Amino acid sequence: MENVTLSPDGKSVVIIDQTKLPNAIEYLTLSTSRQMYDAIFALKVRGAPAIGICAGFSIYCLAQTIEETEYDAFLLKFREYKDYLDSSRPTAVNLSWALKRMGKVVLDAKDKSIDEILSLLKAECIAIKEEDIKICKAISEYGLEFLKDGDGILTHCNAGPLATSQYGTALGPLILGKERGMNFKVFADETRPLLQGARLTAFELHEAGIDVTLICDNMASIVMKNGFINACFVGCDRVAENGDTANKIGTSGVAILAKHYGIPFYVMCPTSTIDLNCKTGDDIEIELRSEDEIKSKWYEKPMAPSDVKCYNPAFDVTDHNLITAIITEHGVCKAPFEVSLREAVKKAEDIINK
């Protein structure tokens, strides 16, 4: 079940509409810049790596529609599309990372024909997805080192195959362990207000044959206190240089509880999610979303007075002091994060620049 791919003719992006899960598996074909923007903004495609993959495919498809045959005019229109897609969601760094990577292809090909540039763009967006498959497998292998057969794991939001291209990040070690005969007891936070834990994580783990129990977000403390949890596994959307980590709203609360109960808290992400230009979590822009997601989205009738104000940040920042380790495809990063994260990013850059 591929969640993000190119259409057979390479002119459109095909995604699973994650807003319809788990009740229906519906595929959407994205052919225009507006459709692509809306798919990312409305969370029809979500998860930092999956957003990056979708952005890479999208900008390639849009580049094919540019009618300009002269390089400078082509570049100008390409940048318009790139900036438009980049504005869809501000917190997940993989979006801008993928678009910058595609943009570099165009900048480095000034002396080539437009047809040659399009061929290079196609190769690059396909490479982004193929690399993500290998990255998720590597993260899963490293993460599995921190698991024992029978462990109880708490998750928040969704960082499984739907959020990436295969295996996932935070769910990857669990799925890989299951493939190798291990068993786990996973407690999945429902993850209000958009219920990614209920709709997506519980769905993926159940499909994988993993023992999963869905809980409300405000039940995280009691399952920890009861001794049900051996570790917390989460993904993330951006990591600052000092190790502060932006992830789905509610993640920082889970980390604080884990610290209180002496439970290790692991963050799993590709190095593309690490933003060394962002010094601390204070520098991460937090996306604010519609009040309707809280008051009315999941109900036949609104569950609050229509004129009641709502505060709906999509993400919060987990302080680096609460994080046991950040697990990447190039190894396990521990404090001091300024050193270990930079080393992981350098390994990734060295491979790309070979």
Swiss-Prot record:
One of its GO terms (molecular function) is S-methyl-5-thioribose-1-phosphate isomerase activity. InterPro entries: Deoxyribose1P_isomerase_DrdI, IF-2B-related, IF-M1Pi, IF_2B-like_C, Initiation_fac_2B_a/b/d, M1Pi_N, NagB/RpiA_transferase-like. Substrate binds at R46, G47, A48, R89, Q196, N247, K248. Its EC number is 5.3.1.-. SUPFAM superfamilies: NagB/RpiA/CoA transferase-like (SSF100950). It is an enzyme of class 5 (isomerase). Pfam families: IF-2B. It catalyses: 5-deoxy-alpha-D-ribose 1-phosphate = 5-deoxy-D-ribulose 1-phosphate. The record marks C157 as: Transition state stabilizer. Belongs to the EIF-2B alpha/beta/delta subunits family. DrdI subfamily. Catalyzes the isomerization of 5-deoxy-alpha-D-ribose 1-phosphate to 5-deoxy-D-ribulose 1-phosphate, as part of a 5-deoxyribose salvage pathway that recycles this toxic radical SAM enzyme by-product to mainstream metabolites. This is 5-deoxyribose 1-phosphate isomerase. It comes from Lachnoclostridium phytofermentans (strain ATCC 700394 / DSM 18823 / ISDg) (Clostridium phytofermentans). The gene is drdI.
